[in-house]
């Protein structure tokens, strides 16, 4: 459904998963992919809420690093450099070996350059 841009149907399915399995891995995945769907539609506040749900409700889930990175990207796109850098720092510090950390390092450099925050 995601690849076919059938976002409304996919979001409905993810909502059903969250309702049926509110505390399990399925819910964390559903929140994460809901965030991705909202991002694809440029619905940043909805995406932020979805990624924050992963971070707040599932602190040990494998999607934490990706969710923190996505939150940083949302803040970057919205022009919130300080908040973006804070999220990137969390990813880099806590998930140094992850793919998200590598992406966060690149995004961090870009934000610092754009904000004249280069050390």
List PLM regions with ranges.
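Acidic, polar-rich low-complexity tracts and alpha-helical solenoid repeat scaffolds
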Residues: 1-119
